[in-house]
Design a protein with these regions (language model features):
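Preference for long, amphipathic alpha-helical scaffolds in soluble/luminal domains
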Residues: 1-642
Length: 642
């Protein structure tokens, strides 16, 4: 069989995928797909219902079914599909199943318990797991690193303060500071006994914080933690109440209605427990709307329930819009109308009247970004903003001009000192803070990364303002310095080196670099070298642990599409590898869509991974449509930034 798809085959695949994606669009123009993580968020939701004595037995039963389905052959729970045993996820899942009412003597519980003990016991779980255990009364509070609420009073110039953290850390830590200060016991109708998963009785453990440490800073911060614990009697008095009020005000100002604090589950749950701790008898009026926000994260299907970490409507809509605008040339007259509806929906969600947390570091920047979720006005991100801006610009309707310009100005204002961009904040790069005991996940910060930087360069280059060239050049210099020896780039928000390399090659092409530039050539050669025998590409989440590319055991439609888009961006539209990839996508398409078992993104490398359920739908459509358009073009060059 000819490896190249015929024009008819390609058109049929595009039509089927476009029809499928069109049917998933909501009446108001937006798309939103499931965003799935591992066992930890559903387990934490179980704890929350028990903590608040608001248990839904049927929902909990279905969460139990979900947890059992994703239990690994090793007896525990992984962080991603077919992943290795993860201690913290396994402790949470086991505890959740026990809270739901599963018999500890059941074979699957025995396997989980033994696996936990074989990996050091629950006492070796990470900090956020131990926080949950402390809230449940399963361990003493000394098992959690000390974080005095007086941190709220520390100024921005101090070596540690809440503004030095990433947005996700800030929105979680602030209510947690109040919880730690008040140390509530919750409303558990009955204590959940978990001593059987500890190798040492919790009350006898003294070395809750121990190495290996990432650097010498780890030893320093452990000593500081010990000193803070000794000082707790004093800290319980000095400036405590005013710090609690300041933390509560911070949360109140960012409560965000039915979208929740930070629009992420952990921050919502901690804010709920914070208010409960502050008003344990009568409750707090804000608690009702927080419960509403959490309920909107619940997914129920096929007898199972899980809780999403957040929702992704802006991201899903702008990416679907790019796929559809690329597919419009296939001849379906309804596609353009769907893109227009998506653009109008996005336009209404630009954040122009709120100076979010980003303004603490960039006070002169003008608001103009988009958030990832439905509403998260204090926390727009430059990644979503750049991708939305490119879609509105490609649409070409003059009514979007002002919004695009505001996005441009905000993104320029958010560039970091080193020329790159972080997602939510500028210069959020005090790396020593990742060594504090509270940050054993190593994800306290939001430093510049290649994928986000690339998106900003793509956007600014697509707009083509001559005055922005110096901004773009600084970004390019950052990307050149961040390239790995094999030619790839790290992917902070998608898996992993394929995602990062796709992002950067699109940007370098948009910025006008010659495709023979060694930076581009090395990256393209790397992508070509890792194509799989079936024509697809597939990278495993283990690449984050290995600090280098790790092949998945199967090709992923989304990653295949990224590789195709990357190669086409730098002049390889006619390369046999691209044609083989198109053949792979065509042959694996079923009723207009693709299956994708594996996780395809990351929340925190080595700690928390994600599966975007929409990636398998819109990215292959995007890539196949791009190939069709380049086949038909005279220049064979990608003219857009994305």
């Amino acid at each position: 069989m000819n490896a190249n798809l015929s024009p008819q085959e390609l058109s049929e695949a595009i039509s089927a995928a476009s029809d499928t994606l069109s049917r998933r669009q909501n009446a108001d123009g937006h798309w939103v797909f499931e965003l799935e993580a591992d066992a930890t968020i559903p387990a934490e939701y179980v704890f929350l219902e028990h903590y608040m004595d608001r248990v839904s037995p049927e929902r909990q039963r279905k969460i139990g079914e979900y947890l059992l389905r994703i239990q690994g052959d090793h007896g525990g729970w992984p962080m991603f599909t077919d992943g290795e045993f993860n201690l913290s996820a396994s402790v949470k899942a086991y505890a959740a199943l026990k809270a739901i009412g599963h018999d500890p003597a059941a074979p699957y519980m025995e396997r989980a318990r033994q696996a936990i003990l074989d990996h050091g016991g629950a006492e070796r779980a990470n900090v956020f797991t131990r926080i949950q255990l402390a809230l449940m009364g399963a361990i003493p509070w000394r098992g959690v690193p000390s974080m005095p609420v007086q941190i709220m009073h520390l100024p921005k110039w101090f070596f540690f303060n809440i503004w030095a953290m990433s947005y996700w850390a800030r929105t979680c830590v602030t209510p947690l500071l109040v919880i730690q200060a008040l140390r509530p016991s919750g409303h558990f109708p009955q204590k959940i006994e978990l001593r059987e998963i500890f190798k040492t009785p919790p009350e006898e453990i003294r070395d809750w914080i121990r190495g290996p440490y990432r650097s010498r800073w780890g030893h320093v911060f452990k000593l500081i933690d010990g000193a803070l614990k000794l000082a707790e009697p004093v800290l319980s008095v000095v400036a405590r109440d005013s710090a609690i009020r300041k933390a509560a005000t911070f949360v109140e100002e960012r409560l965000n209605g039915e979208d929740g604090l930070g629009a992420i589950y952990p921050a919502m749950a901690y804010s709920l427990m914070m208010y409960d701790a502050m008003s344990p008898a009568q409750g707090h009026p804000n608690m009702a709307v927080i419960w509403e926000a959490i309920d909107l994260l619940i997914v129920e299907k096929e007898g199972e329930v899980y809780c999403q970490p957040c929702v992704s409507p802006v991201w899903d809509t702008c990416l679907s819009g790019h796929a559809m605008i690329e597919a419009a040339s296939n001849g379906d007259p309804g596609v353009s109308a769907k893109v227009d509806a998506a653009c109008d929906w996005l336009l209404a969600r630009q954040i122009t009247d709120v100076r979010g947390d980003w303004a603490e570091i960039r006070p002169d920047a003008v608001p103009g970004g988009w958030a990832f979720q439905y509403r998260n006005d204090h926390y727009p991100d430059v990644d979503d903003t750049a991708v939305v801006g490119m879609l509105l610009h490609r649409n070409g309707n003059p009514k979007y001009t002002t919004a695009i310009e505001r996005a441009r100005r905000w993104i320029i204002g958010m560039q970091s000192r080193n020329g790159g961009w972080g997602a939510f904040d500028a210069d959020n790069d005090r790396e020593y803070l990742n060594n504090i005991p509270f940050a054993d996940h190593g994800a306290l910060l939001d430093p510049p990364t290649a994928d986000v930087t690339a998106r900003c360069i793509s956007f600014l280059s697509q707009l083509g303002h001559a005055d922005d060239r110096h901004v773009i050049e600084r970004g390019i210099a950052y990307l050149r310095g961040d390239q790995k020896p094999d030619g790839s780039w790290f992917g902070r928000w998608g898996t992993n080196y394929i995602y990062g390399t796709w992002s950067v090659l699109c940007a370098l092409n948009a910025a006008g670099l010659d495709h023979t530039d060694p930076t581009i050539a090395r990256a393209a050669d790397w992508l070509l070298s890792i194509q799989r025998a079936d024509g697809g590409w597939g990278e495993d989440e283990r690449s984050y642990d290995q600090n280098g590319y790790v092949e998945n055991k199967e090709s992923l439609p989304s990653q295949t599409a990224w590789a195709m888009l990357a190669l086409m961006a730098v002049g390889h539209a006619g390369h046999p590898a691209v044609e083989r990839a198109a053949r792979y996508l065509k042959e694996n398409q079923k009723e207009g869509e693709w299956e994708e078992r594996s996780f395809n993104a990351v929340g925190f490398p080595r700690v928390f991974y994600l599966k975007y359920h929409g990636y398998r739908l819109f990215f292959p459509l995007f890539a196949l449509s791009r190939l069709q358009n380049l086949r038909r073009s005279n220049s064979k060059e990608v003219a857009s930034g994305f």
